[in-house]
């Protein structure tokens, strides 16, 4: 290498801005989805199956949420509040909740897995326009055993994250599917913020049953 080229290279290394800066690889982020409320006017008088929540992801900085036992407790708690919110804010819909679904699968004599083990957390992906197999088949058989509902409401996944202002953000991915065809009729990523996990979750649920929600397509 010539003396001139060595001097140019040395200058480039010492003086900022001569060589292009190397960007650090960005961290993978959860796909964003719009928080769209579900209008229940089009569901009035109809039976809608509600599957249980099976996935919760909590930041390790949130106390009391780590480990299988804590996650199981959060799932039961979140399901209970979700079901209560549906009954309180949309009593015009004939909701079929997870306890009834569990009894139905028990009566099936092993033909269907428990509704807690059907793999419905896959529906958290915002790219899915249809329910994939084998979940599609499970849901179709499940609603047939539990009364023949046309739609299935699936709370797919829940995320709990702390903020820098000592509050918590709870996000809930939920979809409404046509139980017969598997088509996704409605999807939301409901988000709420609060001083406690309960406050944040209640705020998230309030966005799901908004008065100006979008009715499912026929």
Which residue stretches match the model-derived regions?
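Bacterial N-terminal signal peptides that target proteins for export
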Residues: 1-9
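C-terminal/domain-edge helix-coil "capping" segments
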Residues: 22-60, 78, 118-119, 129-151, ...
């Amino acid at each position: 290498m010539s003396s001139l080229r060595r001097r140019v290279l040395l200058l480039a290394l010492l003086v900022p801005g001569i060589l292009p800066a190397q960007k650090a690889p960005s961290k993978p982020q959860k796909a964003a989805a719009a928080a769209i409320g579900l209008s229940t006017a089009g569901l009035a008088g109809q039976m809608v199956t509600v599957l249980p929540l099976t996935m919760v992801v909590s930041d390790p900085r949130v106390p009391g949420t780590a480990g299988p036992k804590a996650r199981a407790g959060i799932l039961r708690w979140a399901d209970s509040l979700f079901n209560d919110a549906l009954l309180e804010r949309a009593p015009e819909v004939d909701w079929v909740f997870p306890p009834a679904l569990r009894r139905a699968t028990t009566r099936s004599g092993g033909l269907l897995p428990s509704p807690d083990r059907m793999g419905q957390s896959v529906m958290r992906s915002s790219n899915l326009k249809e329910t994939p197999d084998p979940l599609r088949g499970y849901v179709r058989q499940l609603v047939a055993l539990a009364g023949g509902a046309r739609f299935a409401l699936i709370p797919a996944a829940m995320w709990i994250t702390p903020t820098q202002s000592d509050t918590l953000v709870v996000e809930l991915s939920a979809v409404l599917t046509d139980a017969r065809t598997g088509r996704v009729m409605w999807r939301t990523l409901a988000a709420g913020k609060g001083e406690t996990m309960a406050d944040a979750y209640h705020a998230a649920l309030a966005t799901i049953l908004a008065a100006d929600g979008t009715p499912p397509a026929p």
